[in-house]
């Protein structure tokens, strides 16, 4: 995936990396959401998402070298993720203006290490990326992308971009009133019925991620290259 017009704006970015917090429980259903989204996109069976942090190293020299390498990789992932996030906001700003005659309200992009808290509760790396409707923020531990590439066999920029675009898709659902409507229906639905609607909510977020990819190309934000689709399947 090639950037034609990249947006590195950080006005809607919150960096919590390296800021330790008490490890909290993952938001209910978040793991299932990510597993479903990745399954639909890659065709792989992701039955669990595990902690992606690796163990310690044996010497101080090795530790310094590895830490420097990881820090550089982490920063590159931050830049890439922020560009995808900003491009998704640019796309939905255009769509809301042209099709809905509404002003698009941008969410906030939060990167964290190991664990964090949100208005939806606590979460850790094992939760995977998630969107919290209560504070309108997208959360991600960037180490997730290493797991996406190695354990889940979904390498490539497009696979990583899809994950972020999917979470922004949940923000779009919030703005359109879809999320609130489902919450209002919850008390009237059985658990089985509610789960069916939850799956549909995920499918729609997948569809919105596809809209991002399509519009981002039309708006000359990105250009898909040979192998991009294959790398995510």
Task: Identify the residue ranges that each predicted region occupies.
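A Zn2+-metalloprotease active-site environment signal
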Residues: 6-19, 27-233
């Amino acid at each position: 995936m090639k950037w034609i017009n990249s947006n590195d704006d950080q006005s809607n970015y919150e960096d919590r990396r390296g800021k330790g917090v008490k490890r909290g429980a993952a938001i209910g259903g978040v793991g299932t959401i990510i597993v479903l989204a990745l399954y639909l996109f890659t065709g792989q069976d992701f039955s669990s998402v595990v902690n992606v942090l690796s163990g310690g190293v044996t010497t101080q020299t090795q530790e310094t070298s590895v830490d420097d390498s990881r820090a550089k990789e982490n920063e590159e992932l931050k830049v890439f993720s922020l560009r995808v996030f900003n491009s998704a906001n640019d796309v939905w700003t255009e769509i809301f203006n042209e099709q809905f005659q509404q002003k698009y309200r941008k969410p906030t992009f939060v990167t964290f290490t190991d664990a964090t808290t949100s208005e939806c509760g606590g979460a850790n790396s094992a939760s995977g990326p998630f969107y919290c409707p209560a504070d309108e923020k997208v959360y991600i531990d960037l180490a997730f992308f290493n797991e996406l590439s190695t354990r889940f066999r979904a390498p490539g920029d497009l696979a990583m971009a899809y994950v972020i675009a999917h979470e922004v898709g949940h923000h779009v659902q919030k703005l359109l009133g879809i999320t609130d409507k489902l919450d209002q229906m919850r008390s009237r639905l059985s658990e089985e019925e509610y789960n069916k609607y939850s799956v549909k909510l995920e499918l729609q977020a997948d569809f919105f991620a596809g809209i991002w990819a399509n519009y981002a190309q039309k708006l000359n934000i990105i250009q898909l290259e040979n192998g991009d689709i294959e790398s995510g399947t």
